[in-house]
From Swiss-Prot:
Signal peptide: none
Gene this chain is encoded by: proA
Keywords, ordered alphabetically: Amino-acid biosynthesis, Cytoplasm, NADP, Oxidoreductase, Proline biosynthesis
Pathway note: Amino-acid biosynthesis; L-proline biosynthesis; L-glutamate 5-semialdehyde from L-glutamate: step 2/2
Gene3D superfamilies tied to this protein: Aldehyde Dehydrogenase, Chain A, domain 1 (3.40.605.10), Aldehyde Dehydrogenase, Chain A, domain 2 (3.40.309.10)
Name of protein: Gamma-glutamyl phosphate reductase
Function: Catalyzes the NADPH-dependent reduction of L-glutamate 5-phosphate into L-glutamate 5-semialdehyde and phosphate. The product spontaneously undergoes cyclization to form 1-pyrroline-5-carboxylate.
Matching PANTHER family: DELTA-1-PYRROLINE-5-CARBOXYLATE SYNTHASE (PTHR11063:SF8), GLUTAMATE SEMIALDEHYDE DEHYDROGENASE (PTHR11063)
Entry's EC annotation: 1.2.1.41
GO molecular function: glutamate-5-semialdehyde dehydrogenase activity; NADP binding
Catalytic activity as recorded in UniProt: L-glutamate 5-semialdehyde + phosphate + NADP(+) = L-glutamyl 5-phosphate + NADPH + H(+)
Organism of derivation: Chlorobium phaeobacteroides (strain BS1)
Protein family membership: Belongs to the gamma-glutamyl phosphate reductase family.
Alphabetized InterPro entries for the sequence: Ald_DH/histidinol_DH, Ald_DH_C, Ald_DH_N, G-glutamylP_reductase_CS, Glu-5-SA_DH, GPR_dom
GO CC field: cytoplasm
């Protein structure tokens, strides 16, 4: 298998070197062609997706991530069109100056080269990643999970067909076999792949980080907190907590832990009331539990254990922790946060400013839902992932994060003494 994969990766590397010959207009035309062909191929894609769904327990938190539908495919097509409309990130001049010796120097953005994505469940990622990589001049190597095998194969077949129709080398995109051996080969394909971006569970991300000899950009798990301050508006709190927890509980920006100021415990039942409609299970600490007892459905209320803090639930479950102050909330977040998205609900400007300044996360919010941590919501088009690390990229990663830069120097015969 290793030899076969390396031969294909060499073709991908060669294809990546030719992408610089495509104009931005060529790329945009190809992306729009792909978006326009999704509806006509939706039946084939959805049938393949159903084969994957049939192999998964509907109660599995990953089921919703795996699920495609006509409306989701329409949304994907719209996202691809949005990417086509964005300005190219390649060729931007970051710095430009003339040195004392007359050399003209400029720093300009260039593609990373070959981008490898290892991911689980989400077949929409196949479309998103290809669109972003092509727009930024990169070739793409995909390693999807076995749970989305049929979906990914159908999507890649469509994309490669569109590449050929637009006179672009189909080796610009390569889908690896879905088994674990292929993942190991990919993670050590130095010289073939320039960067690996894992998307999925913390287990997958840890595996990629520890096993890879290719540079890795982590798109970390989301252990997401919202702190309801002493000065928080009750109605705002109800709406934000409900949205952050229930909009799409299986995604990484969904709320996991509500921190509530001790002096607002009397309002906890009101904040939690809408959650009962969605049958959200609450793990409440020793102070929050009595505040919810008899005011929240007993079958949905449990006493919290230490393990419930620092857990990414990815389902209709959440924990509640009582804190005595903003300082306590900050300490709890510092201990359990995955540095993804954190929010505060407060009217006190000092509290808001202190929270936004001191919380170490890729995205911090005041008086709004963490559900907005998303490349499309940020106006970036589709996203490649949400990075929780600090080097190269942080937060929603889109086109700009798929580029590096090089120095271009022009002279008229200068030599160095």
């Amino acid at each position: 298998m290793k030899e076969t994969i390396y031969k294909q990766l060499e073709k991908v590397r060669e294809a990546s070197r030719k992408l610089c010959t495509l104009s931005d207009s060529d790329i945009n035309s190809l992306l729009n062609d792909l978006a326009n062909r999704i509806p006509g191929n939706s039946q084939t894609i959805l049938e393949a997706n159903q084969k994957d769904l049939d192999r998964m327990d509907p109660n599995d938190p990953k089921y919703d991530r795996l699920l495609l539908s006509t409306s989701r495919l329409e949304s994907i097509a719209s996202d691809i069109r949005n990417v086509a409309e964005l300005p190219t990130p390649v060729g931007r001049i970051l710095e430009k100056r003339t040195l004392p010796n007359g050399l003209a120097l400029k720093k300009t953005t260039v593609p990373l080269g070959v981008v490898g994505i290892i991911y689980e469940s989400r077949p929409n990622v196949t479309f998103d990643v290809f669109a972003l990589c092509l727009k930024s001049g990169n070739a793409t190597v995909l390693k999807g999970g076995s749970d989305a095998m049929y979906s990914n194969m159908a999507i890649v077949d469509l994309i490669r067909e569109v590449l050929v129709r637009n006179n672009v080398n189909p080796d610009t995109l390569y889908l690896l076999p879905s088994d674990r051996e292929a993942a190991g080969i990919m993670l050590n394909a130095v010289g073939y792949i320039d960067v690996i971006i894992p998307r999925g569970s913390q287990q997958l991300i840890d595996f990629a980080r520890k096993s890879s000899s290719v540079p890795v950009i982590e798109t970390g798990a989301g252990i997401v907190h919202t702190y309801f301050d002493l000065s928080g508006d009750l109605q705002m709190g109800k709406e934000i907590v409900f949205n952050a927890k229930t909009r799409r509980p299986s995604v990484c920006n969904a709320l996991d832990t509500l921190l509530i100021h001790r002096e607002r415990l009397d309002d906890l039942a009101s904040i939690a009331e809408p959650l009962a409609e969605k049958k959200v299970i609450i793990f409440a600490d020793k102070d929050a539990y009595p505040a919810l007892l008899s005011r929240y459905p007993s079958e949905l209320l449990q006493k919290a254990e230490e393990k419930h803090f620092g857990t990414e639930f990815l389902s209709l479950k959440m924990s509640v922790k009582t804190v005595d102050s903003l300082e306590d909330a900050l300490k709890h977040i510092a201990r359990f946060s995955s540095m993804h998205s954190e929010a505060v609900i407060a009217s006190d400007a000092v509290v808001k400013d202190e929270f936004l300044k001191r919380v170490d996360a890729a995205v911090v919010y005041a008086n709004t839902s963490t559900a907005f941590t998303d490349g499309a919501q940020f106006g970036l088009g589709a996203e490649i992932g949400i990075s929780t690390q600090k080097l190269h990229a942080r937060g929603p990663m889109a086109l700009q994060e798929l580029t590096s830069y090089k120095w271009v120097i022009e002279g008229d015969g200068q030599t160095r003494a």
